[in-house]
UniProtKB/Swiss-Prot annotation:
Protein name: Nucleoid-associated protein Smal_0858
Source organism of the structure: Stenotrophomonas maltophilia (strain R551-3)
InterPro entries on file: YbaB-like_sf, YbaB/EbfC
Upper taxonomic lineage: Bacteria, Pseudomonadati, Pseudomonadota, Gammaproteobacteria, Lysobacterales
Principal location listed in the UniProt entry: cytoplasm
GO molecular function, one term: DNA binding
């Protein structure tokens, strides 16, 4: 019994270290989402902070279209961050025996 608990504690510590490393890696990435065939692009960090927005000048005459494209480009970048985060977090917990139904990140 004690061996199982010690092993579980070691496993938890290793997983915590891996998760922290993955979170640090995620914070450093930048991704760009785009919409309208590249007429609008939004660059976000792993923490989903906006770094850059690029808008094709031809869209200035259609504010409603521009609003939709900015939102779509932001959502595209956000989805890319989510996918990258899921991948890195999955790698961080690879080989760890989690209880049934427990998913990471929490």
């Amino acid at each position: 019994m004690r061996g199982n608990i010690a092993q579980l504690m070691q496993q938890a510590q290793k997983m915590q270290e891996n998760l922290q490393k993955a979170q640090e890696e995620i914070a450093k990435i930048e991704v760009t989402g785009s919409a309208g065939g590249g007429m609008v692009s939004v660059t976000l960090t792993g923490a989903k902070e906006c770094r850059k927005v690029r808008i094709d000048p031809s869209l200035a005459s259609d504010p409603e279209m521009l609003e939709d494209l900015i939102a779509a480009a932001f959502n595209d970048a956000s989805n890319k961050i989510d996918a990258e985060s899921k991948s890195k977090m999955g790698s961080a917990t690879a080989g760890m025996q989690l209880p049934p139904g427990m998913k990471l990140p929490f």
